[in-house]
Amino acid sequence: MDDEVGMTEGAPPESPSIAGGRVSPFILLCLMGFLGRLSYEMLRSPITSLFAKKIGAPTEVIGLLVASVTITGIFVKLPSGSLADLFGFRRLMQAGLWVKATAPFLYLLVAVWPVLLAVRFYHGLSTALYAPAASAQVAKFYPNERAARLGTYGAAENAGVVLGPVLGAAVLAWSGFSVAFVVSGVIGMLALLVVMPLPKDDPPRAVSKTVGEVTKGLVAGVRQIVGNPAIRLVSLMEATLYAGVGTLQAYLPLYALTVHVSTAQIGLIFGGQGVASIASRPFMGSAADRIGRRPFIIGGVALCAVVLVAIPFVSGFWPLLGFNILFGLGTAMVTPSTTAMIGDLVKQGEFGAAMGVFGSLWDIGHAIGPLIAGVLIAWLGYQIAFTIIAAFIIIALVVFALGSRGSEFGSK
């Protein structure tokens, strides 16, 4: 029996009764993912970069300020995934959403960049706590259509990724940073309310154990997952790709300003990237279930690397929008397949740990990209810096292409 809702493994969970109706937990998860990402992404790009510049942060530090939420994820996602396996998915999701509902209001207190850094570290706890639990629950309930379901859930999250920058830039252009922070906080509170009707977790499996025993079990489970070379290889590929994603999130807004693109248009550029991803992820996930994960990963990563090289060689709203749409298509090809491949590789009952390890390694790349890019941009400029980041992505792609031909990856 399933620990969360008492269902047989692989069957969809029973729909809870909400306000006299029947609402699927999968729909609730997708709505939570949308609202959570909408709140979160409002303050990631372009607002964080522009706000950091407004309060006097140097160029090299802006990458750190954007990446700091991701740095939190590096250290928190790994144990949070394992804790979800032990204590329940819903509990971990609620903890993360409490942070998501409160963190945006703290931005109102920021006047200097070191305080902004502290707030960003705290804000990073939100996704670090709930994201592995949400992905693990989807992967666990739908093993026969894992990539398709994860693609649909990813599309729901990416609806928030699409609208977040657009809404954030629009509110910023209309009424300033303070109102944008408040709007983000209100949306975060709505995400918390949505997750409340989900079926309650069973009593934690570890309540009868001491803290030391629980910790020892977590370490053993995580060590088993980290020790799987196939999981490490897939995570490395996703991490390297997200070094490019993080670079764009941190420095594309600043580059766009140098080529006379307005704040509102910057939001639309990021929105275009998200629309491409949202529209294509479910189809990419379904196709990967049929054809195989590996071709989609290789093709998508290659496309993203080429686009990353090209972006700083163009100027104007329409060229930047076009290249960002292509970048969104590339990530849509990759992420449903990498996440599903992780699900293919793990043992039953270890989905949370696996997604936590995957998320932590993914976040390492997501954080390192902007940090390296900031130094390179200050030293060499946008064109050379973006080309260097793309070169690292291509190197990782070659490693993945050669290493993923083993039997442990199966037919997919």
Go through each PLM region and give its residues.
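Helix-to-loop junctions at the C-terminal end of transmembrane segments
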Residues: 76-88, 281-292, 377
